[in-house]
UniProtKB/Swiss-Prot annotation:
It comes from Bubalus bubalis (Domestic water buffalo). This is Pregnancy-associated glycoprotein 70. GO terms for molecular function: aspartic-type endopeptidase activity. Belongs to the peptidase A1 family. It is found in: Secreted. The keyword Protease applies. Expressed in chorionic epithelium (trophectoderm). One of its GO terms (cellular component) is extracellular region. N-glycosylated. Its EC number is 3.4.23.-.
Amino acid sequence: RGSXLTILPLRNIID
């Protein structure tokens, strides 16, 4: 979440 990874599918596990 705002980690920057929000553009990656990983956002589903870090949301």
